[in-house]
A protein has these predicted regions:
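Conserved small/polar residues in nucleotide/adenosyl-binding loops
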Residues: 99-101
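N-terminal structural module
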Residues: 1-56
Length: 101
C-alpha cells in the first residue's frame, strides 16, 4: 500500500536525485480534453523546499502541460526506479507556469 506525506523527506530527496528521468502529468477540466503525460529529464528538476519543487519545461507547439497548468494548476510528477528495489514516488500538487518571453 502506498504511503502519503505532506512533505518531501530526506529519503525522497535522495531518491529524486538519483533519477535520470521523471514524468509530468496534467489534465484539463473539460471532459473532452485528454490527460497529458510527458517524460522529462536532463537536469531540469529541483527540490526547493519540503513542500515545493520546480522544473524547467521546454515549450513546444501544442504544449498541453503549460495550457493545463494555466487553466487549473493540477499536476502530478512521478519518479520511478527499476533497480534491485523498484520504487515509485508521486508528487501531487498545484503547478504554476512562469512563461519567459
Amino acid at each position: 500500500m502506498g504511503k502519503f506525506s505532506k512533505q518531501i523527506s530526506e529519503a525522497n530527496r535522495a531518491f529524486i536525485a538519483k533519477q535520470h528521468m521523471y514524468f509530468v502529468a496534467t489534465a484539463p477540466l473539460s471532459k473532452e480534453g485528454r490527460v497529458n503525460l510527458s517524460p522529462k529529464g536532463l537536469d531540469s528538476f529541483k527540490v526547493i523546499s519540503d513542500t515545493q519543487v520546480g522544473y524547467m519545461d521546454l515549450v513546444s507547439s501544442g504544449n498541453e502541460t503549460s495550457a493545463h497548468t494555466l487553466e487549473n494548476g493540477r499536476i502530478t510528477i512521478m519518479f520511478c526506479s527499476y533497480d534491485d528495489k523498484p520504487q515509485i514516488l508521486r508528487l501531487y500538487g498545484k503547478g504554476l507556469s512562469l512563461i519567459h518571453i
